[in-house]
Design a protein with these regions (language model features):
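Active-site loop/helix belt of alpha/beta enzymes
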Residues: 1-111
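C-terminal accessory subdomain/extension
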Residues: 109-219
Length: 219
């Protein structure tokens, strides 16, 4: 990838220095592992094998989450699953294990033509029941989803209306059968990879941008 580490020339040009080090693990990282048909994966794996022949007794690793799914020939001595632990790889068959519950702070009725949020970017087309929730772009709900994203009550989408604020977001709950105590960022049919696509980014960025105010509970 030409980011860090040694290329082929640097490796063989410094073998004496390298062999004097207490080596424990030889690492590389696949540049195109998220594209299973990309021939660069094979090319990079073969180069890795060639370079590792210089250190036959040292453990080797080239695969992170996506690389692990490319097959056993990419596993070597160790794999490094990261986002895969959270099921954040589309069409992988992995169980989706992330859920973010967002508490409702207030619900109220707005009339037709009333406006919502900074710069009044949303105007109600009819009388609506809305809810304001305790999450915003400081927590990882990006502003790009203003007036186009959604949160969920069970599997029912609740459209985001108005601009997403630093700490707050407002959604339309007119169609819900009850007033919810909280909504969720994801649903069984709308997971991290779908959320990332709507944000025009990747799942990794979505997850690392989740703020410290979001409590983590592992079960």
């Amino acid at each position: 990838m030409n980011r860090l580490g040694l290329n082929k020339q640097a490796l063989f040009g410094n073998l004496d220095k390298i062999n004097s080090l207490p080596l424990n693990l030889i690492l590389s990282h696949l540049a195109c592992a998220d594209d299973i048909l990309n021939r660069e994966n094979i090319t990079q794996k073969n180069l890795f094998i060639e370079l590792c022949k210089t250190f036959p007794k040292i453990r080797k690793s080239i695969a992170a989450s996506h690389g692990t799914l490319l097959g056993n020939e990419f596993h070597f001595d160790m794999v490094r699953p990261g986002i895969g632990l959270y099921g954040g790889i589309k069409n992988s068959g992995l169980e989706k294990v992330i859920q973010i519950k967002v508490p409702v702070l207030q619900n109220f009725i707005i009339d037709k033509n009333m406006q919502v949020g900074y710069n009044f970017t949303y105007k109600a087309k009819h009388k609506m029941k809305v809810a304001t929730l305790s999450i915003g772009y400081a927590d990882g709900l990006p502003r790009i989803l203003s007036n186009r994203g959604k949160l969920f009550y069970e599997n029912i989408p609740c459209p985001i209306i108005g601009r997403i604020s630093m700490d707050l977001v407002t959604v339309d709950i007119s169609h819900l059968p009850t007033i919810p105590e909280d909504l969720c960022m994801f649903s069984p049919e709308y997971q991290v990879d779908d959320f990332a696509k709507d944000c025009k980014t990747i799942s990794h960025e979505v997850l690392v941008n989740l703020g410290e105010r979001i409590s983590r509970v592992y079960s």
